[in-house]
Amino acid sequence: MTSRPPLFSLTLLSACALGYEILLIHLFAIIRHHHFASMVISLALIGYGLSGTCLSIWRLPLSRLYPAVYISCIIFFGCSVLGSFLLVQQIPFNGDEVIWDKYQLVYLCGQFLLLLLPFFFAATAIGLTLYVYPLRITTIYGFDLVGAGAGSLLLI
């Protein structure tokens, strides 16, 4: 691809993704028990891993449609950040009942699937950008790291 990579939007996306992760950790520490807050990190990693798996399978068709897929992932990220958190609040999960109520594990899995969606969309946009612009990987990765650092610092 001869055009330039979308470095500014990629930086903002990375900042928002890591900021959202930190926000979820704080919210889970308040709303749920503190040990559920540490599970947010694994949620983000699962979302990124799932994205990498999908990109390894469908990278060629997705790279041909890069601008549309990139913009769609950013839009879906924004919608899923708010939507997934609101939907998770409707799931009747109670961590105290996990031991004797088998449905609580189903509710927990449902919450996990909903909450990993924003991380999946962010990682898909970032990963596809890295694939489409192979000669600019160091620059793209640098802007991604700057965005992640900025997103962390702004929330702390």
Predicted features and spans:
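Alpha-helical transmembrane segments of multi-pass membrane proteins
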Residues: 1-156
